[in-house]
Amino acid sequence: MLPIQCKMARTALEMGVKQLADAAAVSTNTIVRFERGEDLKPRTIAAIRTVLEEAGVIFLDGDYSGVGGPGIRLKAME
């Protein structure tokens, strides 16, 4: 997950920094730093990504990115 994908995912979910930080068991400063492009430990990024995926985000990376580059998509609501 790239920092911009984290920001896009939070925005799409209408999730605040504090809400994501609490759910991922990290500080709000950690989320802010990551979204600014600062490096985090891989396990911290994984924890944040897991919360976003469980909330319905699909990350578009690699072969799925196409011309537009990495992005996100929301799972269809049932």
Where are these predicted regions, by residue range?
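Helix-turn-helix/homeodomain-like alpha-helical modules used for DNA recognition
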Residues: V57-E78
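Recognition helix of helix-turn-helix/homeodomain-like DNA-binding domains
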Residues: A25-L40
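DNA major-groove recognition helix of helix-turn-helix/homeodomain DNA-binding modules
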Residues: A25, P42-L60
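Short basic helix-loop element that most often maps to the first helix and adjoining turn
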Residues: I4-Q19, A76-E78
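Alpha-helical residues within the helix-turn-helix
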Residues: T11, D22, R36
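Conserved hydrophobic/aromatic packing and binding residues within compact polymer-binding modules
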Residues: C6, L20-A21, I31-F34
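Short, conserved glycine- and acidic-residue-centered signature motifs
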Residues: L2, L13, K41-T44
